[in-house]
C-alpha cells in the first residue's frame, strides 16, 4: 500500500508542478523568480534547476520518487522518462537501488502509481542490459554516484568508455542526435587499445552518451555533497531535461520550496525534543546511563499498541582511541548484555546486512558504529544515541543524531517518552554540549537557529541513571532587528517578556523562556509598530508585489510567526 503524502510533502510536489508548468512558457529563471521572488542561479543555461529543502527525517527520498512523474508530465512531456538518480555514496546507492527495485516498498510504489509495471531500475553496471525497446516505453531509473561521472578527463572513467554492447542504441542516429555527443579521440585509444585509428571521430557508444541522448531527469539526493564547478560541468555533459536537488542544507541552490523542522514535528515525522545528558566522567558512565535509558524506554514501549523495540546507537571512538568498537563490545558483554542483542556496523564489519530491525523476532537492541551509519541508514526504532567521542572533537555526531530522530510509524506515540529522542555525550558541561549540537543541527541537518534552540532539551537530572520527566523548557530565542525599538510605549506584558540589546545593525530582540502565544502576538504588533515610518512604507510597498519574501520587517514578521509554531516544539 502506497504511503499517503504528508501535507508538506504534497505542497513540495505541488510547488514543483507549478514551477515546471510556468517554466515551459516563461523559462526556468523567470518562472523561479516569479514564484519565489528570489534571484535565480543560472548554472545549467536554461535547464530548470531547482532545490527542495527538507530537514533530516523529512522523507526526501519519497518526495524524490514522486517528483519523477511531476517533471515528466509537467515539463519533459513524456510518459516514459529516463531518470538519473544521483546519490553521494556507494552505501546510499545500494540502499536506494534496493528500495526502488522492491515492488513492495513505498518508494517504488510512488513511481508505480504513474507507470505501473513499466518501471526499470538499474545501476550503471547493469544499464547495458536495458533493452533498446524499453527506451520510450518504460520509466528507466538509473541510480549512481556523482563520482562515477565527475572528472575533467573523461577517458579516465568507465562511464565514458566505448562499449560495443551499447551499439544497438546508437544505430541510425541523425546528425542532430549526434551533435554534442562525445567522440572517440586519440586519448581514447590510449585507454581502450582495442579501438583503432579508424574509430577516431566516431560517436562513442558509451553510457554517458546514451544518457545524453535520453535527456534524463536528474534527481540529486543530498545535493550539498555534489556542489562545485566540476559537478555542474558533469551535469551539462549529460544533457538533462531538468535537475531536481533535495537536501537539508542547500548551498547556492535555487530553493523552490523549504520545509521547516517544526513542520516535520507537526506532521509527526520526527521525535523532538532531543533530551541531552552530558557525562564529564568519561565514556563508561555515558554508556551506562544510555543503556539504562534504553531499558526504561523498552518498558514504556510495552504500553504502546504497536510493536516498538527501542535501539541504542553507540558511536565508539576510532582505532586510535580508548573506547574502540572492540572495547565497547567486550565492555557490554562483560556487563551481562547478551551478545545476540549487539550488532556492529562499521566499514569492515556489517552485521546489520539483511537484518530486518523492525521484525518482532529480531533481538538487536544495541548497534555499535563509528561513522558508517552517518548516512544511508534509517531505523525509526533508534531512540538513544551514546557518543563516546569527546564532544570537542566528535566527528559526524549530528549525522548520527539524525538516525534517532525518525518517529516510529510516522505517528505520535501515546507514551510521552516515546515522542522524544535521547543523546548521551562525553562533555564537561551540558551548555557546551548543547551549543555544539545546536550549531551542527543548523549547519548540517537543516534546522534553523530557533528550531535548534528548542530541539535540544537538557536533562535536569538522573534517577538511578535513568532520565526522569522534567518540566517543560523553552529556551530563549533571539531575532535580529534592523531598527532599535522605542520600548517606552510597550505594554508591561511585552516588556516583561523581552530584552532588547543594541547591535551595529540595529538591535537583537530576545524573547524569554516560557512566553505564551498571546504574548508572542503582542510582541509582534509592538515591534512592527515601533519601526520607523520609512521602513513601514517600504514594507507596505513590498506587500503589494505578487510574490515577495521580502526583507527587513517581512523577515521579522515571518520570524515571529515561526516562533509561534516553534512554541509547541517541547
Spans of model-derived segments:
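Conserved Walker A/P-loop ATP-binding site and its immediately adjacent core
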Residues: 79-111, 145-154
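Conserved C-terminal RecA-like helicase domain
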Residues: 58, 151-211, 291-375, 380, ...
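Post-DEXD/H (motif II) to motif III coupling segment of the RecA-like Helicase ATP-binding lobe
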Residues: 225-273
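Walker B catalytic acidic pair
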Residues: 221-222
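Walker A/P-loop NTP-binding motif
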Residues: 61-78
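Conserved pre-motif I regulatory segment
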Residues: 1-53
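Catalytic cores and motor modules of nucleic-acid processing enzymes
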Residues: 81, 125, 134, 206, ...
Amino acid at each position: 500500500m502506497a504511503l499517503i503524502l504528508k501535507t508538506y510533502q504534497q505542497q513540495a510536489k505541488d510547488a514543483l508542478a507549478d514551477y515546471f508548468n510556468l517554466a515551459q512558457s516563461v523559462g526556468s529563471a523567470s518562472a523561479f523568480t516569479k514564484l519565489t521572488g528570489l534571484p535565480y542561479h543560472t548554472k545549467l543555461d536554461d535547464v530548470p534547476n531547482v532545490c527542495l529543502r527538507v530537514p533530516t527525517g523529512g522523507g526526501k527520498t519519497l518526495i524524490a520518487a514522486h517528483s519523477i512523474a511531476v517533471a515528466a508530465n509537467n515539463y519533459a512531456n513524456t510518459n516514459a522518462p529516463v531518470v538519473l538518480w544521483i546519490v553521494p555514496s556507494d552505501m546510499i546507492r545500494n540502499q536506494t537501488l534496493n528500495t526502488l527495485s522492491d515492488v513492495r516498498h513505498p518508494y517504488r510504489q510512488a513511481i508505480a502509481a504513474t507507470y505501473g509495471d513499466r518501471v526499470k531500475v538499474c545501476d550503471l553496471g547493469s544499464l547495458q542490459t536495458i533493452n533498446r525497446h524499453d527506451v520510450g516505453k518504460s520509466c528507466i531509473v538509473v541510480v549512481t554516484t556523482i563520482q562515477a561521472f565527475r572528472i575533467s578527463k573523461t577517458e579516465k572513467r568507465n562511464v565514458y568508455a566505448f562499449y560495443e554492447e551499447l551499439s544497438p542504441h546508437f544505430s541510425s542516429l541523425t546528425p542532430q542526435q549526434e551533435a554534442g555527443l562525445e567522440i572517440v579521440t586519440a586519448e581514447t585509444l590510449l585507454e581502450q587499445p582495442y579501438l583503432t585509428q579508424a574509430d577516431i571521430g566516431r560517436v562513442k557508444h558509451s553510457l554517458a552518451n546514451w544518457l545524453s541522448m535520453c535527456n534524463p531527469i536528474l534527481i540529486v539526493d543530498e545535493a550539498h555533497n555534489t556542489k562545485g564547478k566540476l559537478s555542474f560541468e558533469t551535469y551539462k555533459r549529460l544533457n538533462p531535461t531538468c535537475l531536481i536537488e533535495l537536501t537539508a542544507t542547500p548551498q547556492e541552490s535555487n530553493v523552490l520550496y523549504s520545509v521547516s523542522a517544526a513542520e516535520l514535528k507537526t506532521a509527526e515525522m520526527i521525535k523532538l525534543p532531543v533530551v541531552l545528558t552530558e557525562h564529564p566522567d568519561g565514556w563508561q558512565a555515558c554508556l551506562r546511563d544510555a543503556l539504562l535509558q534504553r531499558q526504561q524506554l523498552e518498558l514504556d514501549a510495552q504500553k504502546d499498541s504497536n510493536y516498538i523495540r527501542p535501539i541504542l546507537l553507540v558511536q565508539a571512538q576510532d582505532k586510535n582511541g580508548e573506547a574502540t568498537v572492540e572495547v565497547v563490545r567486550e565492555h557490554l558483554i562483560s556487563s551481562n548484555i547478551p551478545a545476540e542483542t549487539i550488532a556492529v556496523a562499521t566499514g569492515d564489519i556489517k552485521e546489520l546486512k539483511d537484518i530486518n530491525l523492525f521484525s518482532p523476532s529480531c533481538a538487536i537492541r544495541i548497534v555499535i558504529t563509528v561513522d558508517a551509519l552517518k548516512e544511508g541508514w534509517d531505523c525509526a526504532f533508534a531512540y538513544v544515541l551514546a557518543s563516546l567521542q569527546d564532544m570537542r572533537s566528535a566527528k559526524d555526531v549530528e549525522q548520527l543524531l539524525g538516525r534517532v530522530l525518525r518517529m516510529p510509524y510516522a505517528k505520535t506515540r501515546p507514551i510521552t517518552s516515546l515522542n522524544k529522542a535521547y543523546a548521551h555525550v562525553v562533555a564537561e558541561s551540558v551548555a557546551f554540549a548543547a551549543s555544539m549540537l545546536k550549531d551542527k543541527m543548523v549547519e548540517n541537518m537543516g534546522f534553523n537557529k530557533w528550531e535548534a534552540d528548542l530541539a535540544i532539551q537538557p536533562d535536569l537530572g538522573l534517577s538511578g541513571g535513568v532520565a526522569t520527566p522534567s518540566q517543560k523548557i523553552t529556551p530563549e530565542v533571539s531575532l535580529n532587528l534592523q531598527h532599535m525599538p522605542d520600548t517606552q510605549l510597550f505594554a508591561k506584558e511585552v516588556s516583561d517578556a523581552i530584552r532588547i540589546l543594541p547591535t551595529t545593525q540595529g538591535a537583537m530582540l530576545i524573547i524569554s523562556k516560557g512566553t505564551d502565544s498571546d504574548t508572542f502576538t503582542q510582541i509582534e504588533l509592538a515591534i512592527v509598530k515601533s519601526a520607523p515610518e520609512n521602513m513601514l512604507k517600504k514594507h507596505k510597498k513590498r506587500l503589494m508585489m505578487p510574490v515577495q519574501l521580502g526583507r527587513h520587517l517581512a523577515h521579522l514578521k515571518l520570524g515571529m510567526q515561526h516562533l509561534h509554531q516553534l512554541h509547541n516544539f517541547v
